[in-house]
């Protein structure tokens, strides 16, 4: 079978050209024609993990991003079973990241992993890697970029320092101790899972701050328009703004309550230190297999605030996590207070507008009362004049001054005017009329 032209060498191509010039070769070429190969399909953007090719399983696959502590990153299309096997989590914990329960923020601490579900940040963190759900979403991209920019630099620093640790000199043991401090200093006192949790809380807080700033600017503009003109359109804009603030407040309150719950639960805080447990298991295994090796330890009394930690993780990790969560708890509390301030500003403006509307309504009621009193006086005068006018003598259509008709009309008008004045005086003294 003849090969395609793309795989022929230069000499073979020349021979093929000379062979094709003869009539016999033309007949052979018509017999041995090779059909053109179709173009290969484009490579998929992500690897597909998980067993089964059914439509149901294909529908359950979701996009994940895997990032390890050395900066290795890849996109994976997989189902829950693959994620459960890789992270060591039971299936019930993965339901927290599902579409039904994703609206309830939670931070779950398990034996081998930590599940983070904070608004748009949904991730599974182990001691060595992090799995981020839906990394291409618009609101998740800042968090993903933060991770990708941070951990490659950290891995380079750790690699350089660990290379320095393996160099031998006259003071070998002292050099190992100093390098151990440098490794921990390169990590900024935070284990891998603490750094991911730090970035997740930071991304959520930045999103909240951005949202409340936008709502604050919108509130100022909307309320200014409302004070100028109380219309249906402006009232609808205020109602929509209050609904957005209510949803944001509920979201911030849920995240704040979750952080507060972890701060109050020391056992849950200890379970979050997955790196400490993994490192302790590795150190125990190394001690059993190689008892002659010495662990890099330090007995310095310098506090944690100096930025130096021991190589073997200790209970100070829980203290570091406590300070980290407490800082974000205060930040979330500040965001909640900002929401309360904006809501109070809206409520105060609504109260001011309500006072103005009440004042206008009182003015209208005063005007209505004035018109009613005046109409009452005119109606009485008209009724009396109409009832008794036929019994008053007159000389045709020419009325003469001094006849009973003029006296009667004057007396009736004076009486009605007196009644109107009395009614106005009563309304004025009882503050039924506006000033």
Curated annotation (Swiss-Prot):
GO terms for cellular component: membrane. Residues 19-54 are annotated as: Disordered. The keyword Transmembrane helix applies. InterPro entries: MRS2-like (IPR039204). It comes from the Eukaryota. It is a multi-pass membrane protein. GO terms for molecular function: magnesium ion transmembrane transporter activity. Keywords: Ion transport, Magnesium, Membrane, Transmembrane, Transmembrane helix, Transport. The keyword Iron does not apply. Its main location: membrane. It is found in: Membrane. The chain crosses the membrane at residues 369-389, 408-428. Putative magnesium transporter. Belongs to the CorA metal ion transporter (MIT) (TC 1.A.35.5) family. This is Putative magnesium transporter MRS2-H. It comes from Oryza sativa subsp. indica. The lineage of its organism: Eukaryota, Viridiplantae, Streptophyta, Embryophyta, Tracheophyta. The gene is MRS2-H.
């Amino acid at each position: 079978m003849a090969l395609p032209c793309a795989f022929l060498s230069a000499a073979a191509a020349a021979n093929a050209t000379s062979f094709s010039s003869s009539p016999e070769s033309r007949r052979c070429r018509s017999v041995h024609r090779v059909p053109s190969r179709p173009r290969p399909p484009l490579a998929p953007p992500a690897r597909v993990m998980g067993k089964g090719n059914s439509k149901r399983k294909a529908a359950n696959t979701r996009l994940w991003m895997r990032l390890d502590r050395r900066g290795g990153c890849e996109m994976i299309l997989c189902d829950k079973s693959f994620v459960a096997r890789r992270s060591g989590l039971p299936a019930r914990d993965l339901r927290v990241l599902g579409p039904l329960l994703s609206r309830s923020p939670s931070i779950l601490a398990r034996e081998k992993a930590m599940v983070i579900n904070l608004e748009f940040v949904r991730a599974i963190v182990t001691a060595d890697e992090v799995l981020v759900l839906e990394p291409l979403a618009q609101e998740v991209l800042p968090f993903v970029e933060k991770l990708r920019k941070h951990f490659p630099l950290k891995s380079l620093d750790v690699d350089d320092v660990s290379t320095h640790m393996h160099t031998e000199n006259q003071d070998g043991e002292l050099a190992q101790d100093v390098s151990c401090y440098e490794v921990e200093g390169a990590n900024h006192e935070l284990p891998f899972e603490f750094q991911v949790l730090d970035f997740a809380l930071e991304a959520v807080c930045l999103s909240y701050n951005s949202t409340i700033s936008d709502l604050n600017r919108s509130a100022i503009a909307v309320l200014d328009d409302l004070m100028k003109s109380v219309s249906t359109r402006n009232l609808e804009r205020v109602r929509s703004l209050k609904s957005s603030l209510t949803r944001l407040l509920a979201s911030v309150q849920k995240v704040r309550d979750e952080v507060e719950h972890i701060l109050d639960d020391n056992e849950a805080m200890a379970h979050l230190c997955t790196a400490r447990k993994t490192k302790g298991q590795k150190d125990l295994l190394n001690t059993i297999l190689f008892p002659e090796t010495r662990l890099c330890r330090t007995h310095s009394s310098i506090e944690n605030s100096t930025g130096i930690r021991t190589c073997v993780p200790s209970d100070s990790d829980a203290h570091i996590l406590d300070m980290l969560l407490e800082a974000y708890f205060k930040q979330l509390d500040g965001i909640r207070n900002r929401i309360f301030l904006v809501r109070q500003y809206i409520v105060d403006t609504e109260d001011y507008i309500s006072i103005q509307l009440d004042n206008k309504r009182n003015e209208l009621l005063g005007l209505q009362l004035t018109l009613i009193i005046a109409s009452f006086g005119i109606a009485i005068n008209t009724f009396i004049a109409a009832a008794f006018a036929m019994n008053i003598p007159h000389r045709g259509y020419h009325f003469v001054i001094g006849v009973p008709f003029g006296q009667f009309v004057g007396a009736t008008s004076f009486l009605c005017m007196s009644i109107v004045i009395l009614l106005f005086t009563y309304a004025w003294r009882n503050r039924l009329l506006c000033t």
